[in-house]
């Protein structure tokens, strides 16, 4: 599994890099599907809210079977944005994989 991280408008701190790798490992374990690549794009959006900026995280997960999941989250800081994007992917996948009740 490959992990790619790109930051636009800010620097990638060691703490943020650690969070991305932790969340990626957690995702791989929880999904129990073979993941080919996880791409994490981080954008700082200046002036987007009263605090002066907004952190946007886009996570693209490409599985070995060719299917993919894309999730975007916006928060006040990158750490929360990254964590929330990965949590939303886990919630979507569980909902998608659970049997439907009629």
Residue spans for each PLM region:
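N-terminal, polar/charged subdomain of small-to-medium soluble alpha/beta proteins
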Residues: 1-102
């Amino acid at each position: 599994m490959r992990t790619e991280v790109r930051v636009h408008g800010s620097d990638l701190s060691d703490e943020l890099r650690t969070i991305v790798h932790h969340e990626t490992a957690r995702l791989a374990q929880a999904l129990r599907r073979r993941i080919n690549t996880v791409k994490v794009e981080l954008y700082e959006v200046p002036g987007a809210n009263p605090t002066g900026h907004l952190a946007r995280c886009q996570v693209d997960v490409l599985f070995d079977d060719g299917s993919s999941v894309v999730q975007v989250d916006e928060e006040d800081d990158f750490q929360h944005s990254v964590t929330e994007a990965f949590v939303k992917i886990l919630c979507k996948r569980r909902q998608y994989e659970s049997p439907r009740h009629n």
